[in-house]
């Protein structure tokens, strides 16, 4: 299989368009389709913080509906879904930008985008196992011993990473470096934690290069095992990027 997996978009729609064009996709029909039949993959966190979250949802929904893309949800997707369910979620940490876009729409358009996103989310697997198990897309990663499982523990890991329950001085959760200990043969492609450059270690790759924080939007090409990026148009916020020993 040939697929281009895109990191956390977070409403950075213009960079998404530029990246897909750089990857050879054509937008003649209003969505990115590849002349060679390559498909797109998304590690989740399509929305929040960036300027065009709902447009991003529209395009990804259309791609998945026509089986031209694979999508797995991220923690921001999970929170938006709970908002659309009417749950009492805090409209913070970027959700406020998506909600502002949503509330600016006429009621009929609100109903349509809500229906599309909920359908996209409800149909999505917790993580995607592709190419006969040789490739896995999981928002925050996946431990080798969790592959094939879908229980609550795995759901927490996939959405939030290998959290310890403790917090750093800046309020962010303390996370273990699961990728450093990964010994599996399947490629694990993930995002969630912004890094300045794509981080490849032990057949895992973090492709969240912090587009919404002024970094870049990155795609991982499979089976080529290469990355392609476009720079962000947003201001650079260095403290949002994680470094590893």
From Swiss-Prot:
Its EC number is 3.6.1.17. Its cofactor is Ni(2+). InterPro entries: Ap4A_hydrolase, Bis(5'-nucleosyl)-tetraP_PrpE, Calcineurin-like_PHP_ApaH, Metallo-depent_PP-like, MPP_PrpE-like, Ser/Thr-sp_prot-phosphatase. One of its GO terms (cellular component) is cytoplasm. One of its GO terms (molecular function) is bis(5'-nucleosyl)-tetraphosphatase (asymmetrical) activity. Keywords: GTP-binding, Hydrolase, Nickel, Nucleotide-binding. Belongs to the PrpE family. This is Bis(5'-nucleosyl)-tetraphosphatase PrpE [asymmetrical]. It comes from Geobacillus sp. (strain WCH70).
